[in-house]
Amino acid sequence: MVVGKIIKISGPVVVAEGMKGSQMFEVVKVGNEGLTGEIIQLTEDEAIIQVYEETAGIKPGEGVTGTGAPLSVELGPGMLKAMYDGIQRPLNEIENATDSIYIPRGVSVPSISREIKWDFEPIAAVGDEVITGDVIGTVQETASIVHKIMIPFGVSGKIKEIKAGSFTVEETIAVVETAEGEKEIMMMQKWPVRKPRPSKGKQAPVIPLITGQRVEDTFFGLAKGGASAIPGPFGSGKTVTQHQLAKWSDVDVVVYIGCGERGNEMTEVIEEFPHLDDIKTGNKLMDRTVLIANTSNMPVAAREASVYTGITIAEYFRDQGLGVLLTADSTSRWAEAMREISGRLEEMPGEEGYPAYLSSKLAQFYERAGRVECLGSENKQGFVCIVGAVSPPGGDFSEPVTSNTLRIVKVFWALDANLARRRHFPAINWLTSYSLYIDDIAGWWQQNTAADWRSLRDEAMSLLQKEAELQEIVQLVGPDALPDRERVILEIARMLREDFLQQDAYHEVDSYCSPIKQYHMLKIIMTFYKKGLDAVAKGADPAGISAVTVKGDIARMKYLVEDEFVNTKVPEIINKMESELGALIK
């Protein structure tokens, strides 16, 4: 064990001498209080350490003790419903142990409880040959999730002993005979956060992640295993959009990272999720959620750790064959922490003071998303979707964090302050946003909704773009000076914006919209467009088309329950539309 001595302190960065024999990214205990830190640079016998706790009060001459291990997370039953800080310390346990609402410095509490006993049910039997990733048993961790206990990395052989019953995460549940001797298996594993968990290989992202948000699903779809960015200025709805994704996404587990944002946003999640039902299982949303809270008043160095801790936990659930959504709010705060530490290390700054390695760090994080074939002899498939919020100062998308993120991700949901000011939510700008997965996921949509889904979606997008072109003319000469056909286009584009793209996150029905309902809503609006054009071509007045009463039914369709809407209202609206538009023809 290496023991060194502090010679310099600069905010969260500490320099220690006498550290020969230490390794890069080794965890060390700093000062008399044993603050947790990580070695980020080594020079002969000097080590530069980023400390994950407040360094006020420590002084040169105090000791630094190496642990010989990299920053790792504990993986096993007990993570769901938990709330951790950036280095996986359980906040509830710390509060109970210290009777304080603040995290005392140097506190050390196990990430996963060592007291709770879990009912382990074996799947494998004595004599079975097992390899890394094989599931040997299960634990019913929450009402929603059956936790699969897997053979840890680097272990393969024959099961010599396996037992059912109630065990803590550190007790032996099985013994495997390997070439190197007997290995005891327990429910808990440890994994270094900076090392991606291995898999057999990545698969093509061809299945969409259904979020229940019409603008995201229909227009700018994200594939399962994909990565998306949500950049937007302050007050444009980034956090509410991420909360909606965490609530309604078609996944088994949600890992929500609050990285350098306000504490009240995490409080909102803690207060809301235990009362909301998961549409997939009917159980509470909190049963499938892991929260990592690294709020803006916590030490900046831990922001980087929180992002890596979150993605490692997500990969662990992925390896069980589950679908995982990881939301990071906000990656800009992580980048700002990198900039601060880079400045204290006196490194050459890059664009806007960010370090030159900003883009490679972002890429390392986003590239850990993916749909994979999991390790093990079974045919398990899992995926991790990453949705990262970006907070560009002043809404400037050309700043380094946003521009580097856009080079890596394939879905860009651009939040617009002007839309937010007009109370259009979600404030995703349909002219600047894009998805590069549309060609990959179109097959799923056509199979699960209707064959004309892609043509409807493309036509609706072109109408919205046409409206933007016509707006300049309208502002100069007014809508009445336009040809009849273009007046119809303006009316349909308005219906698309207000009746389809706008969605109320706080309405019990409109908060989530299924793929079938999304398709029928779009189909009705586009049918109105075609029939409106036919009516105008046959002599109808565009002003009359704008005044038909069926438009009120179309505006209300988002608030109808899916069964009632699809089975009853769709044919009614189509019939009413045909009769009212037909009556306008001279």
Swiss-Prot record:
ATP binds at residues 232-239. The keyword Membrane applies. One of its GO terms (biological process) is proton motive force-driven plasma membrane ATP synthesis. It catalyses: ATP + H2O + 4 H(+)(in) = ADP + phosphate + 5 H(+)(out). One of its GO terms (molecular function) is ATP binding. CDD domains: ATP-synt_V_A-type_alpha_C, ATP-synt_V_A-type_alpha_N, V_A-ATPase_A. Pfam families: ATP-synt_ab, ATP-synt_ab_N, ATP-synt_ab_Xtn, ATP-synt_VA_C. Its EC number is 7.1.2.2. It is found in: Cell membrane. Keywords: ATP synthesis, ATP-binding, Cell membrane, Hydrogen ion transport, Ion transport, Membrane, Nucleotide-binding, Translocase, Transport. Component of the A-type ATP synthase that produces ATP from ADP in the presence of a proton gradient across the membrane. The A chain is the catalytic subunit. Belongs to the ATPase alpha/beta chains family. This is A-type ATP synthase subunit A. It comes from Methanococcus maripaludis (strain C6 / ATCC BAA-1332).
